[in-house]
Design a protein with these regions (language model features):
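C-terminal motif of bacterial Sec signal peptides marking the signal peptidase cleavage site
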Residues: 25-28
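A short acidic-to-branched-hydrophobic micro-motif
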Residues: 71-100, 148
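Signature of long, low-cysteine stretches enriched in small and polar/charged residues
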Residues: 52-61, 65-71, 104-152
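Bacterial signal peptide processing site
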Residues: 30-32
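Coil-to-beta-strand transition motifs
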Residues: 78-81, 141-143, 152-159
Length: 183
């Protein structure tokens, strides 16, 4: 992965996403791994969540523009699970947005990202779509692991993420493996 540009915008973007996710975790507690199909706020992406997510929306800077970010997030099994989406309205901004989302996740945990290509069924193919594995520390100093998937559909970017002190492979694989864009 090439060296990241200054991260002032991406850090703000991830802080907004992480803040919303942690707020949702405090507000929405449900049994661990009570799997359910959930559609993204725009109805285009489906995922299996192990808890009942709540919707949060916020405007933030991403890829040189201001977007409305819709985040569905919940806490289950000691992890925070989220699916965020934003419409950039301009396909030329997608690569930068995917890079910023991935870089911001890494910066938030002060972690070196391990990335691999990602293909979500039905998603618009994009070379910037990827899975990112992170291990580091949250701003409060607590150790954390995070798995992130960033991808596109049309002019929208999506970020699915799981954050926790420890991430069991099976539920994380179920969640990220369930992502699909609906026809």
């Amino acid at each position: 992965m090439p060296a990241a540009a200054p991260l002032s915008v991406p850090r703000r973007a991830l802080r907004a996403v992480a803040g919303l996710a942690w707020g949702a975790a405090l507000a929405a507690c449900s049994p661990a791994h009570d799997w359910r199909e959930v559609r993204s706020a725009d109805g285009a992406v489906q995922a299996l969540f192990p808890c009942r997510p709540q919707l949060h929306e916020r405007r933030l800077a991403l890829a040189g523009t201001t977007v409305k970010l819709a985040l569905q997030a919940c806490d289950g099994g000691g992890q925070t699970w989220g699916l965020a989406s934003a419409d950039l309205a301009d396909p030329a901004r997608l690569a930068q947005a995917l890079d910023e989302l991935a870089a911001a996740a890494a910066a938030n945990l002060a972690a070196v990202p391990r990335s691999s290509p990602l293909q979500v069924p039905g998603a618009t193919p994009h070379p910037g779509s990827r899975r990112v594995a992170l291990e580091g520390r949250r701003p409060d100093g607590e150790g954390a692991q995070m798995r992130v998937a960033v991808f596109t559909h049309g002019t929208r970017v999506y970020q699915a993420s799981v954050l926790g002190q420890r991430l069991p492979e099976e539920p994380v694989g179920t969640f990220l493996g369930s992502l699909r864009v609906l026809p």
